[in-house]
Regions:
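A conserved mid-protein helix/loop that constitutes part of the nucleotide-sugar donor-binding site
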Residues: 17-40, 58-64, 145
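Short hydrophobic beta-strand element within catalytic cores of glycosyltransferases
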Residues: 117-120
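Aromatic "clamp/platform" in nucleotide-sugar-dependent glycosyltransferases that forms part
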Residues: 81, 100
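Nucleotide-activated donor-binding/catalytic signature segment of Leloir-type glycosyltransferases, i.e.
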Residues: 64-80
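A short helix/loop element that forms part of the nucleotide-sugar donor recognition site in Leloir-type
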Residues: 1-12, 165
């Protein structure tokens, strides 16, 4: 009910499977590969799929233009920069990050806190957060095919339900400020002994 109310408030389709990207809208975030994946999906677009892009950046206008040429252009929503990211996450069904380079993604951690299964590229620290096939999917970077296949899997009810159940069980406390502080202290203590 809360998700439905948020979708009405944010003017999002009520019965869609909403995948969300939150972040800078730039090519280094892999969004040109996402556009190519959407072109691949255009012929066999999952009927319930809607993608929500939240953020601004130097690729935004080009991305909007390329998506406008899709047959399913109305199913790709650009929300621009938003202050209340949590509302958009809570209104969505899964999180998407096709990034080409990543350290430890705050966006992915926020998506996990919102209990969203994640479709992310296997780069940087993403594997510390997402376990492939358990609480989401890890896909190869630079691959429109992998992104398209991952989106299809997120639209599959049984796969999605498994990820959703597991993301709710995953403990992300190891990424809390307190835990990170403890880890840094132990590194500093070790370095002082050298």
């Amino acid at each position: 009910e809360e998700k439905r109310a948020l979708r009405i408030e944010l003017n999002l389709p009520e019965n869609a499977r909403i995948g969300i990207y939150v972040g800078r809208v730039t090519k280094e975030k892999g969004l040109s590969y996402l556009v190519d994946a959407l072109k691949r999906l255009d012929e066999s677009w999952p009927p319930e799929l809607c993608l929500l892009i939240v953020g601004n950046g130097d690729y935004l206008q080009e991305m909007q233009s390329e998506c406008a040429a899709l047959r399913h252009a109305k199913r790709v929503i650009f929300a621009g920069q938003q202050e209340q990211i949590q509302k958009y996450l809570n209104a969505s069904d899964f999180f998407l990050s096709p990034s080409l380079h990543e350290n430890l993604s705050i966006s992915i951690l926020e998506a996990c806190a919102a209990k969203l299964p994640c479709l992310v590229t296997d780069v940087g620290g993403n594997g510390e957060i997402i376990t492939n096939g358990k609480n989401g999917l890890m896909i190869e970077p630079y691959s429109p095919k992998a992104i398209a296949d991952g989106i299809r899997k997120m639209c599959c009810i049984s796969t999605y339900d498994t990820f959703k159940k597991n993301i709710c069980k995953t403990d992300y406390r190891k990424f809390s400020d307190e835990q990170v502080d403890k880890q840094l202290e132990s590194v500093y203590a070790y370095l002082l002994k050298l």
